[in-house]
Amino acid sequence: PIVLVVSGIHAGEVEGKEGCLMLARDLLARGGSLGGDDILARLTLVIAPLFNPDGNDRIDPGNRRLHLPKLEGQLGPASGVGTRVNAAKINLNRDYMRHESVEMRLLQTRVCQAWQADLTIDNHATNGSVHRFSMTYDVPHTVESGRPEPIVYVRERLLPPVTEALKKNHGLDAGWYGNFVEDEAALEKGDVDPRAPVREGWMTYPHHPRFGSN
């Protein structure tokens, strides 16, 4: 199987960019703790570590400024982060169907079509918006998104123990990407309180094919 990892589509969401390079380093280190030789004998790993380089380099302290009532922004770094969009002001994570950007056209023709990956991992981070969980994750929600076997495997077998390990080893709470209903409703009033009790449930975004995660 071929696994494609795409990171850095939104500048400022740097965890995936750093993490996938660390993974590649550890896999290529002979005798590493990850058993790199064994893993790479069974799959091909294709990594696009920084899909939005122009946005990544447009660093400014005003980008992603923290604003809790609107559930947006992030804390630090003091020097600022890059922009969510590319140099042409296109949100690349809304361009998977249109192919308006040069970056997306090249990714599709030279990476996606060339490698025909069996599984794609799209690395984002929620430090551009405020959530109650320290870490969030997601899988496609529709049957049209791909084969059900990997979706069910990730949802039911892979992520539950990852969630438990994060809590046990690092004290971090993790959950599905989205927000609580109370938080979303309070956005219209501009008075979100992340400490308010949760009673009405949880909601997520519409899983349209223009998003890379679908």
Provide a role label for each language-model segment.
Residues 1-214:
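Structured catalytic-domain cores with a bias toward divalent-metal coordination
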